[in-house]
Amino acid sequence: MTFPNVKFIGNKRVLSIQSSVSHGYVGNRSATFPLQLHEWEVDVVPTVHFSNHLGYGATRGSACIPEEVHDLLNALLQDNGIVYDAILTGFVPNHDIIQVIFDCVLAYKKDHPKVLWLLDPVMGDQGKMYVDTNVISTYKAMIPHAFAITPNAFEVEILTDIVIHTQMDAKRGLEKIYQLYGIQNAIITSFEVEESPGTLFCMGYSCEHGKPQLFLYQFPSLSGVFTGTGDLFSGLLLAKYREELDKRKHQQSDETKQTKRPTVLACAVGQVLSCMHTVLVNTKTYADEILLEDPKIASDEFLLSNARELRLIQSRTALLSKKSIYEAEFLPGFEEGEDV
């Protein structure tokens, strides 16, 4: 089927390319609902088809066939004249699929250079890889073409060979990302430092005003196991970034133009972290209540994972909030060409 030659003008439209599960909230299922709440039209292409995420202990399904992913992307990006405002890429299990995605997105960007490509280089967490190692070189080739990346601390280590134990390590990691890949926006979604137990940090930079401007958020760590948070972060970031950008475009007073403000990205990240805090509190509260009612669930991997699924629908009001409960700290930047 081919759509008429219509450009879908007037809607915010994103193509989300990541994992697909029938049950629960990871991958496309975690990113789609928040984006739709923010009035985005979301088209999805799966990279895997699973019954549920791997934390359940047992799952059915398989990785998609590269040719299938290519056909889907070709139909959406080339054949049907659909114009996307953004492309969101997440979990990709192997090199063959990630190469297909890279080729298709790069070809689309040549014809649509203004499309925002938000790349989450999903490779692993806490020292453990959960994709084929041969994706690393392709991710490194992709990053310079993206608008922004959202790695976790372990993924920064893979991309830079810098292990993050301190805030200075995180800054050095971001500086090396900037030097190696030249990307204009990067966020380490969360990391811990040895001297601050119970606290998580999020650090990023944006080149909105030319040189990279660094920002840092810190927020309390919640006990518990949460899955799909990285996918939620990237989906929300796209929504909040566009919202903040549109708001500033409509503020035309001379005073607004002359006022030096935090970058759009820094403001968006603060809103994302605030939204996610509410989602995780709601998720933890629900799981604790379920375990209190039936303590036997704690010994059943499937039921426990089910109780810990993100409470996205129940947090829909919070997901739309434009407030930030956290205050950004703005750090001295780094200069291009410095040794790391």
From Swiss-Prot:
GO biological process, one term: pyridoxal 5'-phosphate salvage
Chemical reaction(s) catalysed: pyridoxal + ATP = pyridoxal 5'-phosphate + ADP + H(+)
EC number: 2.7.1.35
Positions contributing to ATP binding: 189-190, 218-230
Alphabetically ordered keywords of this record: ATP-binding, Cytoplasm, Kinase, Metal-binding, Nucleotide-binding, Nucleus, Transferase, Zinc
Entry GO CC: cytosol; nucleus
Annotated localization: Cytoplasm; Nucleus
Main location: cytoplasm
Role description: Required for synthesis of pyridoxal-5-phosphate from vitamin B6.
Identification of the protein by name: Putative pyridoxal kinase C18.10
Classification of source organism: Eukaryota, Fungi, Dikarya, Ascomycota, Taphrinomycotina
